[in-house]
Amino acid sequence: MTHEQIEYRNYVLQGMASYGGDVAQALVWCGNHFTKLSNSQRNAINKLSAKERNQVIHELTMVFM
């Protein structure tokens, strides 16, 4: 996993913690709180392609299966 993916994973995990593991709600939370991230976190996440973000989400959701 790249540094950028780790930043994104940590961000999504923060959202999941707020919603008891609900991935869908966590992604909404992430969208609503994106501007509150530091510049370096936003830049790292913005560098990710859709495929790279999906890889992170896939990894997180496989834990619950």
Which residues does each predicted region cover?
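The feature represents the first ordered module of a protein
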Residues: 1-38
